[in-house]
Amino acid sequence: MKERYEFCVNGLNIQAEFARSDTRSIFIPLLKQLTRLQAEKNRRIAVFLAAPPAAGKSTLCCYLEHLSRTIPGLTPVQAVGIDGFHYYQDVLDSHTVYRNGEIIPLAKIKGAPETYDVKKLRGLLESLNGENQFWPLYDRRIHNPVENAVEIREKIIILEGNWLLLDEAPWNSLSCDYSIFLRAGDESQLERIVQRKMMGGFSEEHARQIVRSNDWPNIIRCMNQSRRGDLNLAYNQNGILEEI
């Protein structure tokens, strides 16, 4: 049996369903493990949750945050996405990358690893244990980051994104206390991305063009070039999560 929830993700209201069996066998034990880890380290800890585009990272993080605040004995977690570390649109429009023998504007591959300010992300991660920080948030309604939009306040921070476990420089210079990789890669993801882009204001035709030329290659790159996490999960054919 599944339960339905609604979360605000990057400025959009998203509905999600989670199986009760997944909650009992995976999510609650994970949160208990993170609670113990934070207590042992006696400091703020960073957890990476990496997965391909449209695998459900953001909604899963929101759900884990919800569970941690409603189940007694768990240390509350705070979910934060890395999309706020995108370069601004004017930077993407004015800079290029060399790929497959072509010079391509970064704006055409927005969402690819090259379109993030990894140095900025690494700097904030390295100072995570100091005073409460304010991190950027990506707003899909304006297609740009919003600075100082999220206060980092909890002792367990779950950072989610496509490239957090990418085994390529400079991404492989990032460090965390615990990592999770969620494997997913099928055609249904493309439809979810199309709908998400249309909710952000793109026409269906434009959304499908972007998804085929940009998002699908990102899915393949994430699946093939990412390191395994401390916990590795995948949905089976019945939509139930399994450890792999």
Segments from the language model and where they lie:
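Charged, amphipathic alpha-helical linker segments immediately N-terminal to NTP-binding catalytic cores
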Residues: 1-26
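Conserved nucleotide-sensing/catalytic segment adjacent to the nucleotide-binding pocket
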Residues: 78, 85-139
